[in-house]
């Protein structure tokens, strides 16, 4: 026909009792970007005028019948302020899709624009013809397109909005194309409000709908029964990120894993396998924090969300621990690290999640609540609260620092640029240099409990090392009396270790025993004594060099755990902290030193790396466990809006750009096949 569409004409000289038409086509369904087009400079902004030579060639598609009152009213509401032609077409298409309800209409022919607007509904061909009229009245060349729409079920359910069809299907469809200089004919589907993509297969594009009808003609009067059927069959599929294997291939992989597992068990090879997969943001993968920077505005929040999603699967009643991560040259502060610890025997390390604070919430914790918590904790530990030391920022240092700043910098205003020192100083000045930062409790573990004591200092108060890290990392330990003491030796990982006791129960019963029946005063074997009197042999100069810190920060209460050599001591202190939190109805965040390395506990961690976050997943001792860990991790990461793919500048598909290491070993060093 004049539009270049192929037309077949069939003439039947004799009467026929049936007519069957079968259409078969093979369509590559490679995903395309419908916005990937070039626009001539003069047409980048709407409205624009076609050049004279184009107007002649586009004359049939610019023909504008007189608009009825409904159509004129609809067009009159179109915002014609200058803007990007792409944005204009998208908004026009979406407005029509929202205002015209789609309906299946089996009657022949196409509704007029007036009918469609009056009814507020129509079939795909009715909406397409209406959009053709609207575009032409706005000075845009438009044509009617008839063809097929193929929709395939998604490999992965969508995180936002509907996931699309549950089964593959195809149907006859109609949509509109608008001619944009440079880009050519751009498909707009007013039924869905989307641009035409790889699933829109055009068979005919014409100035009038009648010319694009798939079948037209006549028969003599007769009784007709009509039926149709359309189906889609996937002939070939390439492996892709969302579906790398067929079901048969995946079954073979699982079977092979079981076979290897059986051989390892038969030979008593106690191999474990973990990993360090990396992830990037699905929404903003081009931001510096997801390309080159180790830290950024969203990385920690997404990591905390992922950790809380993984925790119920891997380690319910586990400890969430916030700790210092790696520190590389050129970075102003150490990186953060989020960790989750749990006991291998299945007993709780942290009993009640109500007492683990949510980092996104402000609990209104102030200095008074921090002191109340610290005093209650000392009672549970059986030490005197007289050893609690309030900590302050070093006012003299910050007053000196303030005087060294340029005279034109307003430290209490917005003129801070990106200078870390100035930002830190401004925050401190706003809070007040005389405010208590938190409380420190010198603390050491003994076989029978806990010991505390005072810290002799040259200055009357304890002033923290300048900085903005947690106060536990800024204690002036170098100002304490020099002692010749042996560092506590960690438990050897090659030793046989006794099972862990129920330390939560022990802490609760010991605390109850400290109080005489009906009395409110504390009774303890060490009551009224400093720890130096109890264990003078521990430290030469009589000063404990480790401490627990309690700090109100950002409306939450942070407990900084001291370094402890034995896991039992760490768990006992942790249980005391939780019982205190429950007693005061005050959730806490646990930070500071991690539990000592021990074969009786397990962990996974999430840390930042340049351009990615890295998940240090715990080792698995069997193939089914490894499959479960891997599938759970990647699914929960996706639901957190973290993915494993990026695109290079020219569009090439690539991975995260971070390492994806595999770690091999054993449950204990003695069981490692390599050692």
Which residues does each predicted region cover?
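Short, hydrophobic beta-strand segments
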Residues: 554-561, 606-619, 660-666
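A generic structural motif
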Residues: 29, 80-81, 563-567, 618-623, ...
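Helical (often loop-to-helix) elements that flank the catalytic cores of nucleotide-handling enzymes
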Residues: 186-197, 622-636, 666-675
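Short, well-ordered alpha-helical packing segments
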Residues: 24, 93, 132, 173, ...
